[in-house]
């Protein structure tokens, strides 16, 4: 914000003509004697925290008025002070708030926004009669006042005992995943802990999954065919998961107009760094989740209690967060990502809590299906927890029975977010750092902010809304899978993806030319059965072909030689059942191999291999 403060004998104005952004004002002319005239230009930066800029502007005006010993203040919109103006909606809101804050102790006259005005002013002409000030959104003292100190507990679901976290509790924790998550929450950094490049970054390049796109912004990726296949399979998985549970898929825009008050307030509340830009006279932002579009859609729906709980689901391709360059780490933290995002409208808190519990188990199921066990943390405001602790203890008990694990509980003394309760689930990477993935949140603000109502007889009710990402971002899911694959190597097992996600599920390798026709026939039968199989016809040694299959993490490697052709029994190396230095081999017929792979994949999503069957003509992408 830019301001020009004039100690005036008088200020007189008259509004002459409206512009298209003019406010409907009651006062279109006025005069004030012996006053401080404050010319104000609201700037784009002010949109990041309107409350802070109002507070700082009022403090500066009060300080100047008191120094000059004046009790009359004129608030005068004056766009010519800046070339980087904020949106009209934000400017109107800020100017009105400044007037409101000053009115308790001063006589205030505010000129209307968005009008062509004639004015006369007489400046007193003493050394302090003309002052210019740059007002920022900085919150120095307020940050200290508003700092919320949470309490952390370990909940044992077996005896429902809450143990407040302290150094002794931390030193005795045996669950490495839960300990890593707790240390992350408490910002405990361990000396000597690795801070280099995590293994998954090497894997995504080496396996031709994806890589940074140098001609784009940092944190944006190019995806190769194998990586695109994995992402699509993960997307199919989440789609099936939510649709089976009543989710209705929708699609909404990736950018939004910050002149919409609800959009701007929700964006500011979120607090993450955002991609914001100006196009023409509009201030726009790229979404960081699917909330905006889904909330606007719900606002326009005629909702009745019988529709509840109503679940809308979107795979937001893409969502954007402008993370600092130094914070970008492979697939764990990036600027453009694919977020499965479901929002559930609930008629009341009872229904919201039931849906929360259902979605907790849905999130935990994804860890089971991906073979990436989660550590979990519940977060509640103190009031909400005290009112609903028996419900929480019931979940903790069932979690202990199903998974044999404790959980972390964070209690916040007051509500500083739009939610009163949430649960976060995290995979732990090879450096012992959490990768937060699934989440469920109970939102008690957004329905009112966006004007979402349920028509319940003669009443209009603002519902409770759950935010749920059943898996977290697709990129983070893959990050967790690859980090978990690396951890396999520390347990003498080869790194691998689950068979349903592995791009090449089976590779058929002929020992010599005379075995090629038979081997090709086997590969063809596998593909005809819906198995992603290829055929290594390259002119490499047998040893190199087998090593290449290992490098490509092929789950089932089939070698065809004389004995296989004669007996019809294939020699198959099963990767997920092998040790690092000792391959697990089985002799199977083609039919038995098809049955084994089909049983391995079960009812997981299926897609064909998007590469030529013959390895010799498969392109090299990097």
UniProtKB/Swiss-Prot annotation:
User: One cellular component GO annotation, for this chain's record?
Assistant: cytoplasm
Its annotated compartments are: Cytoplasm
Chain intervals for the UniProt region annotation (Catalytic): 199-498
Region Editing domain: start-end pairs:
1-141
GO molecular-function annotation terms?
ATP binding; threonine-tRNA ligase activity; tRNA binding; zinc ion binding
Q: Which PROSITE patterns match?
A: AA_TRNA_LIGASE_II
What does the record give as EC number?
6.1.1.3
Q: Where does Zn(2+) bind?
A: 291, 343, 467
Name any cofactors this protein relies on. Answer: Zn(2+)
Q: Report the InterPro entries cross-referenced here.
A: aa-tRNA-synt_IIb, aa-tRNA-synth_II, aa-tRNA-synth_II/BPL/LPL, Anticodon-bd, Anticodon-bd_dom_sf, DTD-like_sf, Thr-tRNA-ligase_IIa, Threonyl-tRNA_syn_edit_dom_arc
- Gene3D superfamilies given in the database record: Anticodon-binding domain, Bira Bifunctional Protein, Domain 2, D-tyrosyl-tRNA(Tyr) deacylase
GO biological process: one example = threonyl-tRNA aminoacylation
| Annotated cofactor note | Binds 1 zinc ion per subunit.
Q: Which reaction(s) does the protein catalyse, per the Swiss-Prot or TrEMBL entry?
A: tRNA(Thr) + L-threonine + ATP = L-threonyl-tRNA(Thr) + AMP + diphosphate + H(+)
Q: Which UniProt keywords apply?
A: Aminoacyl-tRNA synthetase, ATP-binding, Cytoplasm, Ligase, Metal-binding, Nucleotide-binding, Protein biosynthesis, RNA-binding, tRNA-binding, Zinc
Cystine links in this protein are: none
Any one Pfam family match given in the protein's UniProt record, by short name: tRNA-Thr_ED
Q: What does this protein do?
A: Catalyzes the attachment of threonine to tRNA(Thr) in a two-step reaction: L-threonine is first activated by ATP to form Thr-AMP and then transferred to the acceptor end of tRNA(Thr). Also edits incorrectly charged L-seryl-tRNA(Thr).
Report the domain remarks: The N-terminal domain is an archaea-specific tRNA-editing domain that hydrolyzes incorrectly charged L-seryl-tRNA(Thr). Catalysis of tRNA editing is performed by the charged tRNA itself.
Tell me which family the UniProt entry assigns to this protein. Answer: Belongs to the class-II aminoacyl-tRNA synthetase family.
Identify the PANTHER family for this entry: THREONINE--TRNA LIGASE, CHLOROPLASTIC_MITOCHONDRIAL 2, THREONINE-TRNA LIGASE
Quaternary structure and interacting proteins, as annotated:
Homodimer.
Q: Report the protein name in the record.
A: Threonine--tRNA ligase
In its UniProt entry, the species of origin is given as Methanococcus maripaludis (strain C6 / ATCC BAA-1332)
């Amino acid at each position: 914000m830019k301001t020009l403060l004039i100690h005036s004998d008088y200020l007189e104005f008259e509004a002459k003509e409206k512009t298209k952004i003019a406010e409907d004002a009651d006062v279109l002319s006025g005069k004030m004697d012996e006053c401080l005239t404050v010319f104000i230009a609201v700037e784009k930066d002010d949109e990041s925290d309107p409350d802070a800029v109002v507070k700082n502007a009022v403090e500066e005006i009060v300080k100047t008025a008191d120094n000059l010993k004046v009790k009359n203040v004129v608030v005068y919109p004056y766009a010519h002070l800046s070339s980087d103006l904020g949106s009209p909606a934000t400017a109107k809101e800020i100017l009105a708030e400044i007037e409101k804050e000053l009115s308790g102790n001063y006589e205030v006259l505010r000129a209307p926004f968005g009008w062509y005005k004639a004015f006369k002013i007489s400046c007193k002409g003493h050394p302090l009669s003309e002052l210019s000030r740059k007002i920022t959104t900085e919150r120095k003292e307020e940050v200290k006042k508003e700092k919320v100190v949470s309490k952390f507990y370990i909940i044992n679901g077996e005896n429902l005992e809450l143990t407040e976290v302290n150094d002794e509790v931390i030193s005795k924790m045996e669950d490495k995943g839960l300990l890593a998550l707790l240390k992350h929450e408490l910002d405990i950094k361990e000396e000597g802990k690795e801070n280099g490049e995590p293994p998954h970054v090497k894997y995504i390049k080496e396996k031709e999954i994806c890589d940074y796109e140098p001609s784009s912004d940092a944190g944006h990726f190019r995806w190769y065919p194998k990586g695109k296949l994995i992402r699509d399979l993960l997307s199919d998985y989440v789609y099936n998961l939510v649709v089976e549970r009543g989710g209705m898929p929708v699609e909404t825009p990736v950018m939004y107009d910050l002149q919409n008050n609800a959009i701007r307030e929700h964006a500011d509340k979120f607090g993450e760094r955002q991609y914001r830009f100006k196009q023409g006279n509009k201030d726009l932002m790229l979404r960081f989740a699917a909330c905006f579009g889904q909330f606007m859609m719900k606002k326009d729906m005629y909702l009745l209690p019988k529709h509840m709980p109503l679940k809308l689901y979107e795979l937001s391709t893409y969502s954007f967060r402008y993370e600092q360059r130094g914070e970008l780490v492979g697939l764990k933290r990036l600027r453009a990502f694919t977020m499965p995002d479901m929002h559930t409208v609930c008629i009341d808190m009872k229904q919201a809590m039931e849906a929360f519990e259902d979605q907790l188990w849905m999130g935990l199921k994804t860890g089971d299906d991906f073979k990436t066990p989660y550590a979990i943390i519940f977060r509640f405001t103190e009031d909400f927890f005290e009112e609903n602790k028996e419900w929480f203890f019931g979940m903790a008990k069932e979690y202990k029975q199903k998974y044999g694990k404790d959980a972390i509980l964070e209690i916040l003394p007051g509500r500083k977010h739009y939610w009163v309760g949430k649960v976060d689930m995290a995979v732990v990477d090879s450096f012992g750092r959490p990768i937060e993935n699934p989440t469920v949140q109970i939102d008690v603000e957004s329905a009112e902010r966006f004007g979402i109502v349920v028509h319940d007889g003669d009443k209009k009710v603002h519902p409770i809304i759950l935010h749920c990402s059943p898996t977290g971002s697709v990129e983070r899911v893959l990050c967790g899978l690859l980090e978990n694959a690396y951890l396999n190597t520390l347990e003498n097992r080869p790194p691998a993806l689950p068979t349903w996600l592995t791009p090449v599920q089976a590779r058929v390798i002929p020992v010599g030319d005379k075995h090629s026709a038979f081997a090709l026939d086997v590969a063809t039968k596998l593909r005809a059965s819906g198995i992603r199989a290829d055929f290594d016809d390259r002119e490499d040694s047998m040893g190199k072909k087998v090593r290449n299959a290992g490098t490509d993490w092929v789950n089932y490697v089939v070698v065809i030689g004389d004995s296989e052709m004669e007996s019809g029994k294939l020699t198959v190396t099963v990767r997920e059942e092998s040790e690092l230095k000792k391959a697990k081999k089985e002799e199977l017929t083609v039919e038995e191999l098809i049955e084994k792979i089909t049983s391995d994949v079960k009812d997981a999503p299926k897609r064909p291999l998007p590469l030529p069957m013959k390895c010799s003509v498969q392109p090299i992408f990097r």
